[in-house]
């Protein structure tokens, strides 16, 4: 999995960046998404607040914002088109590989780690996996969705070694 990582806060250690890359690659392997691409940006509460207002119409910061990439194009190409134009096939494959981006609030992660009584490392890993599952179509609006998503989330975190 290819992951672009940006630290807008300049507060995230190399260890946390490496853990984030590692746990996302682990989650991708567990969910069969190894060939996908995504972006992760570490932000402040102020930036999280702006993004939450813009994308979710919620006037407060949040821990992780997950923006799932959904191609808006309804273009379709048959196999002959793709065979005639290998560049087109490559571009479409790249678009198909990109699944979305996460914005993780470093401030919120610190607050929540303290509130929940576990490490900052565990909270950052949790937020990365939680966001990853969201951009892969998982949600928790209904009890059944919540059970499915949270079960997989804990399975990934436990298998990786970030148990509660």
From Swiss-Prot:
Cofactor binding note of this UniProt entry:
Binds 1 zinc ion.
Query: What Pfam family is a match, any one?
Result: YbeY
Q: Which GO terms describe its cellular component?
A: cytoplasm
Coiled-coil spans in chain: none
What is the enzyme's main class?
hydrolase
Keyword check for Nuclease, yes or no.
yes
Cite the Gene3D superfamilies for this sequence: Metalloproteases ('zincins'), catalytic domain
Localisation: Cytoplasm
Keywords on record: Cytoplasm, Endonuclease, Hydrolase, Metal-binding, Nuclease, Ribosome biogenesis, rRNA processing, Zinc
Q: What is its EC number?
A: 3.1.-.-
Sites where the protein binds Zn(2+): 130, 134, 140
- InterPro entries given in the database record: MetalPrtase_cat_dom_sf_prd (IPR023091), YbeY (IPR002036), YbeY_CS (IPR020549)
Q: Which cofactor does it need?
A: Zn(2+)
Nuclease in keyword set? yes
Give a GO biological-process term.
rRNA processing
Annotated GO MF terms:
metalloendopeptidase activity; RNA endonuclease activity; zinc ion binding
Describe its function: Single strand-specific metallo-endoribonuclease involved in late-stage 70S ribosome quality control and in maturation of the 3' terminus of the 16S rRNA.
Return the NCBIfam families for the record: rRNA maturation RNase YbeY
Which family is it part of? Belongs to the endoribonuclease YbeY family.
- This chain belongs to the protein called Endoribonuclease YbeY
Q: Which organism is it from?
A: Streptococcus mutans serotype c (strain ATCC 700610 / UA159)
The gene from which this protein is expressed is ybeY
């Amino acid at each position: 999995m290819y992951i672009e990582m940006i630290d807008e806060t300049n507060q995230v250690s190399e260890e946390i960046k490496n853990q984030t890359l590692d746990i996302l690659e682990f989650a991708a392997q567990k969910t069969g998404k190894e060939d996908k691409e995504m972006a992760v940006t570490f932000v402040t509460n102020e930036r999280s607040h702006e993004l939450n207002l813009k994308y979710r119409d919620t006037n407060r910061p949040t821990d992780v914002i997950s923006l799932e990439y959904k191609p808006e194009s309804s273009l379709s190409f048959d196999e002959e088109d793709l065979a005639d134009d290998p560049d087109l096939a490559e571009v479409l494959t790249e678009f198909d590989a990109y699944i979305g981006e996460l914005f993780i609030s470093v401030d919120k992660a610190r607050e929540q780690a303290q509130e929940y009584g576990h490490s900052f490392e565990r909270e950052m890993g949790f937020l990365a996996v939680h966001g990853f599952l969201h951009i892969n179509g998982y949600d928790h609006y209904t009890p059944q969705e919540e059970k499915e998503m949270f079960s997989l989330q804990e399975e990934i975190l436990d298998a990786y070694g970030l148990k509660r």
